[in-house]
Amino acid sequence: VQCTDCGKFIRPVVALDIDGTMGDYHSHFYEFACHWLGKSPPTPFYIDNLGLDLHTYRACKLAYRQGGMKRTMPMYYFADTLTAGLRKLGAEIWVTTTRPYNRLDNIDPDTQEWLRRHDIQYDYVIYDPDKYENLATQVDPGRVVAVLEDLPEQCDVARKLFGDGAVVQRYNGWVLETAPSNLEEHFYDIAARIGEWND
């Protein structure tokens, strides 16, 4: 799509979450918590706060962040190929995260290193608890063709800002057969959206 005023090519935007979407944060953090606590948490990794009291949970999460564990989080299969493919299709890729950039000095270096190690291609990174509100102030919301996110509450925010059609939930939708089940399938879904944008 070209701008009618300046003739400049306007690229479609794809927003990709990191933790739980491109990287296997949940099981990685759970494994860390087992070692940090010296025992398994009271509940599985998919239960809020692992069943721990809030003080203990926050202390554990802070230790995870300060210990550079974000660098060693496993990448989900196909995340690197997904970003390379989206880039080849002309998408502008925004990596979005709620990681607390301003509170911990190592968050940006650890994030950048994780992206580098896994060859994740991107144009911009947003660190913000309100990451999708931030994105909506930086790009025209109409340019956002896809938001790939694992957390339902973040999906709800993105839907309000970018419309129902733009949001793709990384988990749970596939159980109801309403969304792809893995990143490779997500790639083809998002590629089709980019194709529609370009038409």
Please place each PLM-identified region on the residue numbering.
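Substrate-recognition "cap/lid" segment bordering the active-site pocket of phosphatases
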Residues: P100-V145, P152-V157
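Structural recognition of alpha->loop->beta junctions
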Residues: T111-I126, T178-D199
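Active-site neighborhood of HAD-like aspartate-dependent phosphohydrolases
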Residues: C6-L62
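Acidic, Mg2+-coordinating phosphoryl-transfer loop and its flanking beta/alpha structural elements
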Residues: A146-Y188
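Short cysteine-rich clusters marking metal-coordination/redox-active sites
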Residues: C3
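Short, acidic loop-to-helix structural element flanking the phosphoryl-transfer center
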Residues: L62-V95, R103-Q112
